[in-house]
């Protein structure tokens, strides 16, 4: 797959990546107090459950945000898109061709696309 896209999309990605990162972190932190930690379990078991859950969120964060490079932009943007971290008007800032490619990649990767903008709270 070619990783060619307009320079304007790369610049937009650089701007919106930071916004999406803040939204992702806020979402995770907002979920922690609601994390189901059954009181029948020991503190250690609950800790391990939370640790495992945070590890899964960290894997998601890495997929979408670690080591941003031009060669990774489309895959990272597909993850950001699938996680519902961009508002529709923000996603619309990318060229139609890039948006289409991102949607196809997200689908091919099996990532369930969240309703764009529903969870995209302001950081």
Predicted regions and their residues:
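Acidic, Ser/Pro/Thr-rich low-complexity regulatory regions
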Residues: 1-123
């Amino acid at each position: 797959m070619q990783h060619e896209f307009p320079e304007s999309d790369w610049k937009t990605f650089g701007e919106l990546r930071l916004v999406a990162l803040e939204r992702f972190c806020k979402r995770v932190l907002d979920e922690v107090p609601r994390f189901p930690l059954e009181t029948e379990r020991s503190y250690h078991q609950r800790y391990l459950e939370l640790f495992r859950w945070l590890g899964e969120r960290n894997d998601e964060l890495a997929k979408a945000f670690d080591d941003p490079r031009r060669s990774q932009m489309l895959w990272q943007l597909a993850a950001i898109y699938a996680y519902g971290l961009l508002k529709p008007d923000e996603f619309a800032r990318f060229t139609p061709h890039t948006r289409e490619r991102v949607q196809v990649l997200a689908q091919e990767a099996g990532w369930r696309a969240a309703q764009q903008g529903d969870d995209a709270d302001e950081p």
